[in-house]
Amino acid sequence: MASNRPQLSLKGRALKYLAAREHSRAELARKLAPHAGDPAEIEAVLDDLQARGFLSEARYVASVVHRRAERFGVARIRQELLSKGTPADQMTDALDALRTTELERARELWRRRFGQPPADAREAARQNRFLMSRGFSSDVVRQVLRLADHEHDHDNT
């Protein structure tokens, strides 16, 4: 049975996507592609949305960084942005700002997940893998585990 709802125009569909959350230009173009006959149509809609301020790469980057910063490191967030077609020059400032809090964010994530320094090499490797898989650099992971050990030693003296 066919739906009685009218088909959304490309612009209407794009606005529906943007109302749900921010999108990169490339991501929105990919989502609109199945509904357009001509790629030039999509570009025209995206240009119009960008000119009117509905579509903004800077806002998209800020949104992703805000949503992901608590749980992920710079490398993982950067990879997500690149996979969505965000130009590298659009994310540089946001990721540089995020690097300044990388150690604190990794320590907080480690505290919530583990809370205790690793008891043996196997547990240390597990904690290391967890933080690395979240996109934190090996230097930051090493510092987090070293600080955890140091704090634990201080608490026991």
Swiss-Prot record:
<dbReference type="Pfam" id="PF02631">
    <property type="entry name" value="RecX_HTH2"/>
</dbReference>
<dbReference type="InterPro" id="IPR053926">
    <property type="entry name" value="RecX_HTH_1st"/>
</dbReference>
<comment type="similarity">
    <text>Belongs to the RecX family.</text>
</comment>
<dbReference type="InterPro" id="IPR003783">
    <property type="entry name" value="Regulatory_RecX"/>
</dbReference>
<dbReference type="Pfam" id="PF21981">
    <property type="entry name" value="RecX_HTH3"/>
</dbReference>
<dbReference type="InterPro" id="IPR053925">
    <property type="entry name" value="RecX_HTH_3rd"/>
</dbReference>
<dbReference type="Pfam" id="PF21982">
    <property type="entry name" value="RecX_HTH1"/>
</dbReference>
<keyword id="KW-0963">Cytoplasm</keyword>
<comment type="function">
    <text>Modulates RecA activity.</text>
</comment>
<dbReference type="InterPro" id="IPR053924">
    <property type="entry name" value="RecX_HTH_2nd"/>
</dbReference>
<dbReference type="GO" id="GO:0005737">
    <property type="term" value="C:cytoplasm"/>
</dbReference>
<dbReference type="GO" id="GO:0006282">
    <property type="term" value="P:regulation of DNA repair"/>
</dbReference>
<dbReference type="InterPro" id="IPR036388">
    <property type="entry name" value="WH-like_DNA-bd_sf"/>
</dbReference>
<protein>
    <recommendedName>
        <fullName>Regulatory protein RecX</fullName>
    </recommendedName>
</protein>
